[in-house]
Curated annotation (Swiss-Prot):
<keyword id="KW-0808">Transferase</keyword>
<comment type="function">
    <text>Catalyzes the phosphorolysis of diverse nucleosides, yielding D-ribose 1-phosphate and the respective free bases. Can use uridine, adenosine, guanosine, cytidine, thymidine, inosine and xanthosine as substrates. Also catalyzes the reverse reactions.</text>
</comment>
<protein>
    <recommendedName>
        <fullName>Pyrimidine/purine nucleoside phosphorylase</fullName>
        <ecNumber>2.4.2.1</ecNumber>
        <ecNumber>2.4.2.2</ecNumber>
    </recommendedName>
</protein>
<dbReference type="GO" id="GO:0047975">
    <property type="term" value="F:guanosine phosphorylase activity"/>
</dbReference>
<dbReference type="InterPro" id="IPR011051">
    <property type="entry name" value="RmlC_Cupin_sf"/>
</dbReference>
<keyword id="KW-0328">Glycosyltransferase</keyword>
<dbReference type="InterPro" id="IPR014710">
    <property type="entry name" value="RmlC-like_jellyroll"/>
</dbReference>
<dbReference type="GO" id="GO:0005829">
    <property type="term" value="C:cytosol"/>
</dbReference>
<dbReference type="GO" id="GO:0004731">
    <property type="term" value="F:purine-nucleoside phosphorylase activity"/>
</dbReference>
<dbReference type="GO" id="GO:0009032">
    <property type="term" value="F:thymidine phosphorylase activity"/>
</dbReference>
<comment type="similarity">
    <text>Belongs to the nucleoside phosphorylase PpnP family.</text>
</comment>
<dbReference type="GO" id="GO:0004850">
    <property type="term" value="F:uridine phosphorylase activity"/>
</dbReference>
<dbReference type="InterPro" id="IPR009664">
    <property type="entry name" value="Ppnp"/>
</dbReference>
<dbReference type="GO" id="GO:0016154">
    <property type="term" value="F:pyrimidine-nucleoside phosphorylase activity"/>
</dbReference>
<dbReference type="Pfam" id="PF06865">
    <property type="entry name" value="Ppnp"/>
</dbReference>
């Protein structure tokens, strides 16, 4: 889906890692939320409360998911699932545009 209709955008930015990751929250009529953001090159570890689906719209990163010691390359047009109450690490290799869907 390349656009969202009938949504509310929270104007205040979500800023992480001194501006290395910045996003805006989109709230849908049913109350579900997504964030649309940009990641600068760097290494970032995030923790989750709810399960998430991360869609990489453009860019490239190496990903380490919970319970794994392996790094996997993820690029534009790909996505990955993150379980609830966990953490994951990304080594962002180039400017990366993403959409994160919160499932819980």
């Amino acid at each position: 889906m390349s656009e969202f209709t009938n949504v509310t955008i929270i104007r205040e930015a979500n800023v992480y890692f001194d501006g290395g990751v910045v996003s805006r929250t989109v709230v849908f009529p049913d109350g579900t939320k997504k964030t649309l953001g940009i990641m600068q090159p760097g290494e970032y570890t995030f923790t989750t409360g709810a399960p998430e689906i991360m869609e990489i719209l453009s860019g490239e990163l190496d990903l380490k998911l919970p319970g794994s010691d392996a790094w996997n390359r993820v690029g534009g047009g790909e996505s990955f699932d993150v379980p609830a109450n966990s953490s994951f690490t990304m080594k962002v290799l180039s400017l990366t545009d993403y959409c994160c869907s919160f499932l819980g």
